[in-house]
Design a protein with these regions (language model features):
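PLP-dependent aminotransferase class I/II
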Residues: 2-152
Length: 152
């Protein structure tokens, strides 16, 4: 029924841009068609990574000198840039950026909520998460998909 569908689709609450889950959910679905598609996509993996790295490079160039810090790969590492993100000055700035971008058709999202902030884990023991909470209040995920027209 409805509850089973909710649980098997990660128990995400409907929202235009936030990832909020109201209970423990699962993502156990992989129909044969999806598995076949995954195999076909693997053949194009290096091309996809090159395109994602190009997108990240363009984000970094556009954001250089701005008040946003773009997350780029550490020296000596090679990122696949599956997700591009920026660090805002504070929570107020993060929320203003999220509103402005989404209001203008750019689907940015806040970083995922810390597990201890989710209702189903709110009573679990947790130590201090000062750094994680600082980051949670400041990170915005940028659109990171490869445009369909570039996947040729």
């Amino acid at each position: 029924g409805v509850r089973a569908k909710h649980l098997t689709t990660t128990a995400k609450k409907p929202h235009p841009y936030e990832y909020a889950h109201d209970e423990v959910g699962y993502n156990y679905r992989l129909p044969n068609l999806n598995a076949a598609l995954g195999c076909a996509q693997l053949e194009q993996l290096e091309s996809f990574i090159a395109q994602k790295r190009d997108l990240a490079s363009r984000y970094a160039a556009q954001l250089k000198g701005s008040e946003l810090d773009f997350f780029s790969e550490p020296v000596g590492c090679r990122s696949n840039y599956w997700l591009n993100a920026v660090l805002c000055e504070n929570l107020h700035h993060r929320d203003a950026l999220l509103k402005a971008t989404n209001d203008n058709g750019v689907m940015t999202r806040p970083v995922w909520a810390l597990m201890n902030h989710l209702p189903m884990y709110s009573n679990c023991r947790c130590g201090p998460l000062t750094n994680a909470e600082w980051l949670e209040a400041r990170i915005v995920n940028l659109p990171s998909s490869i445009p369909l027209e570039a996947r040729k």
